[in-house]
Amino acid sequence: MKLIFCLDKNNGMLFAGKRQSRDSILYEELLKRIGECKLWISSYSASLFPQMSNIIIDDDYCSKATENEYCFIENKGYEIDNCKSVIIYKWNRLYPSDTSFNIDLKKNGFKLTLKRDFVGNSHEKITEEIYERV
């Protein structure tokens, strides 16, 4: 499977169980990136995405997604062992956080294959990083 995260400058993900931020352009870019592939999301994330046939809302997505399908991770657990790529969208800001992404991707066999910046709706810079398992 392929995991997708949104992180702040310190790899923060959540604060008090809530997402740190959101940006409509980021979600448009994410949907362009995945194309027609399936995107698994939790019920918590459902309000961020339009209703589309390739978006599946299921709180047990990590156990159901197959090798070439995507999982958007916000407030649920995940397994990096079965993952073949990781996409990280980084906000250009620091937000309060009490849940962070603390996995060393390089130590877990991933290599950065793409890094690009784009302008968001409410963020002057969002960085997309794609890591592939080598």
Locate each region found by the language model.
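Enzymes that bind and transform nitrogen-containing heteroaromatic metabolites
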Residues: 1-134
